[in-house]
């Protein structure tokens, strides 16, 4: 004698729903490619690539020379200006240290 209990597992129900969705979908052969372009495209169109290369040949190169002016925001320089010590100041610091030791 066997007794069957109803299954109340939500995972089982999700699995059954997914199986039903998979069984009811159209085969890939029936899905045709539309001639219109969608708002997104996985692979680039080869004609777009050729057009891009032609435009690229016409673009001018821009050369930017560095300036000695103020540092722009976000740009890091090493060592920072507040840590740069003049040689004259270093010499006076060494003399002060020697005098303090004596």
Curated annotation (Swiss-Prot):
Annotated GO biological process:
regulation of DNA-templated transcription
Gene Ontology CC annotation, any one:
nucleus
Residue ranges constituting the LBH domain according to the UniProt record: 18-101
Q: PANTHER family given for it?
A: PROTEIN LBH, PROTEIN LBH-RELATED
Q: Where is the region Disordered?
A: 66-102
**What Pfam families does this protein's entry cite?**
Lbh
Q: Cite the source lineage.
A: Eukaryota, Metazoa, Chordata, Craniata, Vertebrata
Q: Looking at the record's lineage, which domain of life comes first?
A: Eukaryota
Location(s) in or outside the cell? Nucleus; Cytoplasm
Ranges that cross the membrane: none
Query: Which keywords label this protein?
Result: Cytoplasm, Nucleus, Transcription, Transcription regulation
Where along the chain is composition biased (Basic and acidic residues)? Answer: 90-102
Similarity comment: Belongs to the LBH family.
Query: What does this protein's UniProt record list under function?
Result: Transcriptional activator.
Q: What is this protein called?
A: Protein LBH
């Amino acid at each position: 004698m066997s007794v069957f209990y109803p299954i109340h597992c939500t995972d089982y129900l999700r699995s059954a729903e997914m199986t039903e969705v998979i069984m009811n979908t159209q085969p890939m052969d029936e899905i045709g490619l539309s001639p219109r372009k969608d708002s997104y495209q996985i692979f680039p169109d080869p004609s777009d690539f050729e057009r891009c290369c032609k435009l690229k040949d016409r673009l001018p190169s821009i050369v930017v020379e560095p300036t000695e002016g103020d540092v722009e925001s976000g740009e890091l320089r090493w060592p920072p200006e507040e840590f740069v010590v003049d040689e004259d100041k270093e010499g006076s610091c060494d003399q002060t240290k020697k005098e303090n030791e004596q």
